[in-house]
């Protein structure tokens, strides 16, 4: 019986250990190396990830899941006032970030532990596997997986908690609808603070699909976006219609066809 997304993920790791999990620009990471990285990561407490869209952000999210906690990705461009409102409401136990973003707010003021990736020596990290496994054994499928923040149009952003079961159901529906076979190369254009990113993450974990992290800025440069899709051989996208309309209106597919894209 599957109780968390980690159960699916570890099945995938066993099945395709050397398959590419995530690519970003010239960086890439296999499923096996994820396990190695995640083994050193810090029940059911929110942990903020304040990083740009990157492999480090994906690894942080999965590391938080492995520690049986809840990840909440925040935009590094978030205004300070909005960020402070989120932190006050969320009360995270920790923030994972880097030198460039660690001083955006005074984390200590809110009782948040700062984990600076630029200061971590992975060779000195140790893991209590017995403790982690004990936590895993206590998980149930209605435990929270991640938190997504609303736009905050009413003044204060609200945190929406999504549990494991909701992703089980979503991926099951998507699998029945699109017939995923694990050979998908997903062009992930949405920011990591959007819910669709979490769905793409689960497709990677559940089905063994590869995620290609596309810079969100490419959305306003359709030709460059299509060139990137060609270069990375992307065959699955889940985008807002606006981008597709722009591509169609400019007739870009006639010049930059995407033959590998699934219909």
Residue ranges and their predicted role:
Residues 42-45, 182, 188, 256-260:
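His-Asp-centered acyl/peptidyl-transfer active-site segments
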Residues 158-185, 195-236:
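Conserved AMP-binding/adenylation subdomain of ANL enzymes
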Residues 1-165, 178-179, 208:
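Carrier-protein-dependent adenylate-forming modules in NRPS/ANL systems
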Residues 56, 70, 146, 185, ...:
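Structural signature of beta-strand start/N-cap positions in the alpha/beta core
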Residues 25, 74, 147, 189-190, ...:
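Short hydrophobic "strand-cap" motifs at the C-terminus of beta-strands
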Residues 52, 99-103, 190-193, 217-218, ...:
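Adenylate-forming
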Residues 91, 109-120, 167, 186, ...:
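Conserved helix-loop-beta element of the AMP-binding
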Residues 56, 63, 184-185, 200-203, ...:
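Acidic donor-binding helix in nucleotide-sugar-dependent glycosyltransferases
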């Amino acid at each position: 019986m599957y109780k968390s997304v980690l159960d699916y993920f570890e099945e995938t790791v066993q099945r395709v250990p050397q398959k590419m999990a995530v690519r970003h620009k010239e960086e890439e990471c296999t499923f096996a190396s994820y396990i190695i990285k995640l083994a050193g990561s810090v029940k059911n407490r929110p942990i903020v990830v304040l990083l740009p869209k990157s492999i480090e952000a994906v690894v942080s999210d999965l590391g938080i899941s492995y520690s049986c906690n809840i990840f909440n990705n925040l935009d590094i461009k978030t205004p300070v006032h909005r960020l402070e409102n989120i932190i006050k409401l969320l009360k995270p136990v920790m923030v994972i970030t880097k030198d460039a973003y660690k001083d955006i707010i005074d984390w200590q003021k809110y009782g948040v532990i700062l984990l600076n990736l630029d200061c971590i020596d992975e060779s000195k990290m140790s893991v209590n596997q017995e403790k982690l496994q004990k936590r895993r054994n206590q998980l149930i499928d209605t435990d929270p997986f991640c938190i997504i923040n609303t736009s905050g149009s009413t003044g204060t952003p609200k945190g929406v908690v999504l549990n494991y079961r909701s992703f089980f159901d979503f991926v099951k529906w998507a699998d029945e609808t699109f017939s995923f076979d694990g050979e998908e190369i997903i062009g992930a254009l949405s920011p990591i603070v959007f819910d669709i990113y979490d769905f793409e993450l689960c497709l990677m974990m559940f089905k063994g699909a590869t995620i290609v992290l596309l810079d969100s800025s490419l959305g306003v440069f359709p030709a460059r976006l299509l060139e990137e899709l060609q270069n990375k051989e992307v065959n699955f996208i889940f985008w807002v219609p606006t981008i597709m309309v722009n591509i169609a209106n400019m007739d870009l597919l006639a010049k930059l066809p995407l033959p590998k894209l699934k219909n």
